[in-house]
Amino acid sequence: YFSLNLASQGLIRNLTATDISPGMLKSLKSTAKDLGIKVRTVVTDAENLPFPDESFDVVLGHAVLHHIPDLDKAFSEFFRVLKPGGMIVFCGEPSRYGDRLAAVPKRTGLFVAPAWRRLVGADALTHTAEEMADDEHSLEPEVDVHAFVPADLRAIPPRSGFEHTRVRGEELVANVWGWGMRSMESSATPDSIPWRWRNFAYKSYLGFQKVDNHLLEPYLPAELFYNLLLSAQKPE
């Protein structure tokens, strides 16, 4: 969880977590308890926040905005509950081009998965018809409402009064590599995937992240990347 990671590093002192799903918040609260982090959880949608005006210093989220139907209404709520000078920070939002690009390694990974399983000695994962029907990925077209063009995403916060809006891209090579790895691994039973492979996949992903961070993200336009990061400030 994005907020718990920040809180564990001492970057958040008073944490309030919201979600439309009670089950998700229950899971978050359990994890927070294990980490020794105090958190208040509130079931709500982003377009109708049940908080007084000027309640928070920061409103943040990871992979949240593309699930919200009415973004203008949500950003008006973010603006309302922020104190003057407060910030919004959203990470992990899919770009339209990056989302299309990710489909290539996803398909490729599934295509080469049988050969990969033989190579690493992993067992094929089989699903019952009931499991296939309940697969959470089948819900993606229903819950993934937006894939963003950076210019369009950048235009949303100012309509609610925000200033200093910034959008940048994150992950290009790491995205292609990571989705390929995840697609292959999703075809195998988790316990049968060798530790050496897991270690290789993780470290190679981190290596490609460094390539993105140092060589690509500073120079290429945001729309080429898989993830978009948005920040803006409420006037003081």
Model-derived regions, located:
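Class I SAM-dependent methyltransferase SAM/SAH-binding core
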Residues: 1-48
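A short acidic, Gly/Pro-enriched loop at the edge of an enzyme's catalytic core
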Residues: 47-58
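A short SAM/SAH-binding and catalytic strip from SAM-dependent methyltransferases
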Residues: 58-70
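A short glycine-rich, Lys/Arg-flanked "PGG" loop and its adjoining helix->strand segment in the class I
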Residues: 72-87
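Conserved class I S-adenosyl-L-methionine
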Residues: 87-128
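Acceptor-substrate binding/catalytic loop of class I
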Residues: 136-152
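Conserved S-adenosyl-L-methionine
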Residues: 150, 162-173
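C-terminal lobe and adjacent flexible extensions of AdoMet/dcAdoMet transferase-like proteins
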Residues: 160-161, 171, 180-194, 201-236
